[in-house]
Amino acid sequence: MCSFFLCQTGKQAKISMGEENQTFVSKFIFLGLSQDLQTQILLFILFLIIYLLTVLGNQLIIILIFLDSRLHTPMYFFLRNLSFADLCFSTSIVPQVLVHFLVKRKTISFYGCMTQIIVFLLVGCTECALLAVMSYDRYVAVCKPLYYSTIMTQRVCLWLSFRSWASGALVSLVDTSFTFHLPYWGQNIINHYFCEPPALLKLASIDTYSTEMAIFSMGVVILLAPVSLILGSYWNIISTVIQMQSGEGRLKAFSTCGSHLIVVVLFYGSGIFTYMRPNSKTTKELDKMISVFYTAVTPMLNPIIYSLRNKDVKGALRKLVGRKCFSHRQ
């Protein structure tokens, strides 16, 4: 596998296929989201705002959880991991997209494309696993509150976090290896705005069935399996909440779980649409719009959803702001 990657680095390395000479692709060209100049300027402004909100929002969540001792609980430990994953997820794609809005020729090197896919899949698949872990945490908190502290220990939280990142790394390694094991000769124009396996496979010079099946199998592992766990957890949560006598307890449970459920629907819905259906020979505009949703919009919405619907996070923010105001007065 490594030797195959090394042979791709030669600029315009010549090979022979039958009687016809072809060249290995050394870089890819994106068609982007639009070819219209005015539309690209508007998209640049929109994506810049989204990216700034993503960075500021997720960094704020990470800082608040680190500084406020009241947020040193399993739920916020996993939320901090999720915010970090969102930050890496968006940063692996959006800055390059912003640059491409300002230039006529939108290119990326072969190795740059490979690196982008590795990071994108690593943090994206890790986020899938983290959302499943967070649903299990909510299940234990709502359905087994008396055993919560003994089940969700620090050691268990660290282990679940490690397994989430390890599963993301495994899926990233498998999908990237299968994608770049294929030969890419001659054609190098990607009808997309970043390197994503389904779009890249359309340029492969041989049949991609085995690679598509490998990516589909990994999708089952990292998308459908966690979704099944999430659905099972929420089925038990809803059953428990309905039986609660306290109206305040019901409201608190639905508020806490509601934020997580919104994030799950947004992220998994778009991910399953892209990776769990047959790969067509052409990239449709709808495919690119769905990709925008989970690469740019969802990472921006996550901190907003969790902070606006969470009293603890809002309390930590008020405490931090009050501390800053007090220090300025002194």
Swiss-Prot record:
GO BP: any one term: detection of chemical stimulus involved in sensory perception of smell
Record InterPro entries: GPCR_Rhodpsn, GPCR_Rhodpsn_7TM, Olfact_rcpt
Glycosylation sites: N21
Transmembrane segments: 42-65, 74-95, 117-136, 156-174, 212-235, 253-275, 289-308
Top-level taxon of the source organism: Eukaryota
Extracellular side: 1-41, 96-116, 175-211, 276-288
CDD domains referenced in this protein's UniProt entry, alphabetically: 7tmA_OR2D-like (cd15428)
GO molecular-function term, one example from the UniProt record: olfactory receptor activity
Cytoplasmic topological domain: 66-73, 137-155, 236-252, 309-330
Keyword field contains Coiled coil: no
Record's bilayer topology term: Multi-pass membrane protein
Subcellular location: Cell membrane
Sorted UniProt keywords: Cell membrane, G-protein coupled receptor, Glycoprotein, Membrane, Olfaction, Receptor, Sensory transduction, Transducer, Transmembrane, Transmembrane helix
Protein family per UniProt: Belongs to the G-protein coupled receptor 1 family.
Functional summary from the UniProt entry: Odorant receptor.
UniProt-recorded name of the protein: Olfactory receptor 2D3
Native organism: Homo sapiens (Human)
